[in-house]
Amino acid sequence: MLCRALLQFARMFSSGSYDDVKRWLRMFLNSHAKREDPRIEAVLEDDEAREGRFYAARLRLGSQTSPLMEFEYDVVAQRRGELAWCAALAQRVREQARQLLAGSTAAHAR
């Protein structure tokens, strides 16, 4: 019974339109990046070539940005309800945020 409830819960968050998933991804990235520093913002790039297929995101702290992170729409839409996938993505985002902070600290030390 519990497994069935968990699967139903996961399906509730899976899928969605490109824009719905984009909104979820932006909120997820911001939520985890801001755990490292509330000044960090997640920015999703608008690119017609990626529209409907991919998302491109960076973390920004002032004038500094993280390397580009790309996400396939289908993967995010299907897996955003999976705890293990979300945990791995959160770890990746927080690591990018820490690297961005380390670069910011080094730049201010100069």
Model-derived regions, located:
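Negatively charged, low-complexity tracts enriched in Asp/Glu with abundant Ser/Thr
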Residues: 2-46, 80-91
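C-terminal low-complexity, charged extensions that often adopt amphipathic alpha-helices
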Residues: 2-7, 88-110
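Soluble, non-transmembrane alpha-helical interaction regions
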Residues: 47-49, 60
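Intrinsically disordered, low-complexity regulatory segments enriched in Ser/Thr/Pro
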Residues: 60-91
